[in-house]
Amino acid sequence: EDIAINVTSSYLQVLFNMELSKVAASQTELSKEQCKRIIRLAEVGKASSAEVAEAKARVAQDEMSLVQAENNYQLALLDLSQLLELPTPEGFTLAQPDTVVNFAPLTAPDDIYTEALSNKPGIRAAQFRLEGSEKSIRIAQSNYYPQLSFGASIGTNFYTLNGSAEHSFGSQLKNNLNKGIGFNLSVPLFNRLATRNRVRSARLQQTNLALQLNNTKKVLYKEIQQAWYNAVAAESKFNSSMAAVTANEESFRLMSEKFDNGKATFVEYNEAKQNLTKSLSDKIQAKYDYLFRTKILDFYKGKAIE
C-alpha cells in the first residue's frame, strides 16, 4: 500500500516540476524580449541606463530560476526511477498527461469508511484473527468433556535355539501372533484447573483481538477524515489560485500597456510580472496537491490509483 502512495506522490512531483520548468522557461523568454526592447529604447534616449541594468538583472535572475527548475525536474525524475528500481535513469522520461482538473463531488468520509472496511487488508486480517479466536475458545472448551479413544495392536515374535529346527520361522510368526483392542474413556474430573486456564487464556486473547480490531478501525476512520478535509482544503486552494492567476494576468496586461506608453516604470512592470509568475507557480502546486489528495481518497475506497 505504501509503495502505491509513494509512487503516486513521486510521479505527481515529476509532473509538478515539469510544469514549473515550462513556466520558468516562458518567463525567461519574456524577460529576454523585454530586455531587448528596453535596450532599443535606451539607444534612442527613451529608457535610462538604470532600466537597462534592471532588465539585464531580471534576465539573469530568470535564467537562474530556470536552471533550478530544470534541476528539480531531473532530481524528481531520478527519485521516481529509483523508486521503480530502474537500472538507470538515462533515457527515462514521462509524457505530459492530460492533467485537466475536473471537480467531481467528494465522497463523504462515512461512505469512504464503509468501503474501506471491506477492502483494506489490515482490517480484513484483523477480522479473520478475531473469527479464528472463537474456534480457539471452542477447542479449549472441548477439554471439559469426556473423551473416548480407541486403540488396537498386533504383534508376533520369533526365536531359535542352537541346533534346534523344530519350529520354522513362518510357523512361529503364525503361532506367536498377538492381537489386542481397547477403549479408553477419560473423564476430566480434576486436572489442576488446566482446562479452565486454557479457556480463560483463549477468551482473553479474543478480547485483545477485538480491541485491536476496534482500534484499527478508529485509526482508519481518523485517517479518512483527515484525508477528506485535506482534499477539501486543496480544492479550495486550487480555486483561489485560479482566481489569482486570472487577476494577475489582467494586472500584467494593463501594466504592460502602461509601460509601453511610458506611464509605468520597469520596476512596476517587473513587479506585475513577478506577481503573475508566483500566481502561476502557486496554481501548479495547488493543482497537483489537489490531484494527490483525491488519489488518496481513491486509495481508501479501494480504487486503483491511475
Regions found by a protein language model. Name each.
Residues 1-13, 148, 152, 193-196:
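Short flexible linkers and secondary-structure junctions
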Residues 2-115, 230, 234, 276:
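Periplasmic alpha-helical coiled-coil/stalk elements that build and connect Gram-negative outer-membrane
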Residues 6, 17, 58, 143, ...:
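Outer-membrane beta-barrel pore domains and translocons
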Residues 16, 61-86, 245-303:
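Short segments within alpha-helical structural elements
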Residues 25-26, 50, 54, 124-128, ...:
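Sec/SRP-type N-terminal targeting helices
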Residues 49, 159-163, 194:
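Outer-membrane beta-barrel proteins
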Residues 95-106, 138, 151-187:
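Small/polar, glycine/serine/threonine/aspartate-rich low-complexity segments that form flexible
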Residues 129-132, 136:
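Long hydrophobic segments that form regular secondary structure
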